[in-house]
Amino acid sequence: MLKRLKSFLFKMVLILLIAPIVLVGVVKYVDPPIWGWKLSRIVAPPKNYPDSSQHEWVSLTRISKNMQLAVIATEDQKFPHHYGVDFESLFDVISEAGDHGPSRGASTITQQAAKNVFLFPSHSYVRKAYELYFALLMELMWSKERILEVYLNVVEFGPGIYGAEAAAQNYFGVSAKQLSKWQAARLAVVLPNPYRIKVYPQSDYTARRTRWAMNQMSNLGSVQL
């Protein structure tokens, strides 16, 4: 009985380690038609979630450099240089965490992409550990350009509005390629919580954050991956 249990546990661990490698390998080349975050919204839609979502996948070359710089400036300024995990910020989060897991993310763009594509919303340590594993695999197997492309195509900018192209068209009536510095900053600042922080109507908080984002973009200067 014990031998069979050990064999079962070994196989489960093997599956949990190998399956992410396969998934990350596939998404390196294939744009996912559905992903974990979007699926969770469909299964358990939050308040004000629309009956149909908006999304159009575009390559990174069809997304404004302003938009690329805006998310790096606001979400993860170390993105061009780290290997998927900002361990300093991560240890800070763990030290502040309670009994039920971390209350805030401190996630890199790579971790956010991993969470959005491959996993489901949760604050548990198990999910966070799996997120780190996916993120490290993505950094190992993908280019920085692919990570940023996937992130900018799956992130939710508002209820049911996924990706930079859908957000640009919905909020500004332009393509993602045409986003100005101000428009890109305005979109980027809602990403911590697009259900609480909205592109429109503009609040005083959103206006302040947009100005802050534009200053950060100016300080960084350009996107160099």
Swiss-Prot record:
<keyword id="KW-0812">Transmembrane</keyword>
<comment type="pathway">
    <text>Cell wall biogenesis; peptidoglycan biosynthesis.</text>
</comment>
<keyword id="KW-1133">Transmembrane helix</keyword>
<keyword id="KW-0328">Glycosyltransferase</keyword>
<feature type="transmembrane region" description="Helical">
    <location>
        <begin position="7"/>
        <end position="27"/>
    </location>
</feature>
<dbReference type="InterPro" id="IPR023346">
    <property type="entry name" value="Lysozyme-like_dom_sf"/>
</dbReference>
<dbReference type="Pfam" id="PF00912">
    <property type="entry name" value="Transgly"/>
</dbReference>
<dbReference type="GO" id="GO:0008955">
    <property type="term" value="F:peptidoglycan glycosyltransferase activity"/>
</dbReference>
<keyword id="KW-0808">Transferase</keyword>
<dbReference type="GO" id="GO:0008360">
    <property type="term" value="P:regulation of cell shape"/>
</dbReference>
<dbReference type="InterPro" id="IPR036950">
    <property type="entry name" value="PBP_transglycosylase"/>
</dbReference>
<keyword id="KW-0133">Cell shape</keyword>
<dbReference type="GO" id="GO:0005886">
    <property type="term" value="C:plasma membrane"/>
</dbReference>
<comment type="similarity">
    <text>Belongs to the glycosyltransferase 51 family.</text>
</comment>
<dbReference type="InterPro" id="IPR011812">
    <property type="entry name" value="Pep_trsgly"/>
</dbReference>
<comment type="function">
    <text>Peptidoglycan polymerase that catalyzes glycan chain elongation from lipid-linked precursors.</text>
</comment>
<dbReference type="InterPro" id="IPR001264">
    <property type="entry name" value="Glyco_trans_51"/>
</dbReference>
<keyword id="KW-1003">Cell membrane</keyword>
<dbReference type="GO" id="GO:0016763">
    <property type="term" value="F:pentosyltransferase activity"/>
</dbReference>
<dbReference type="GO" id="GO:0071555">
    <property type="term" value="P:cell wall organization"/>
</dbReference>
<dbReference type="GO" id="GO:0009252">
    <property type="term" value="P:peptidoglycan biosynthetic process"/>
</dbReference>
<keyword id="KW-0573">Peptidoglycan synthesis</keyword>
<protein>
    <recommendedName>
        <fullName>Biosynthetic peptidoglycan transglycosylase</fullName>
        <ecNumber>2.4.99.28</ecNumber>
    </recommendedName>
</protein>
<dbReference type="GO" id="GO:0009274">
    <property type="term" value="C:peptidoglycan-based cell wall"/>
</dbReference>
<keyword id="KW-0997">Cell inner membrane</keyword>
<keyword id="KW-0961">Cell wall biogenesis/degradation</keyword>
<keyword id="KW-0472">Membrane</keyword>
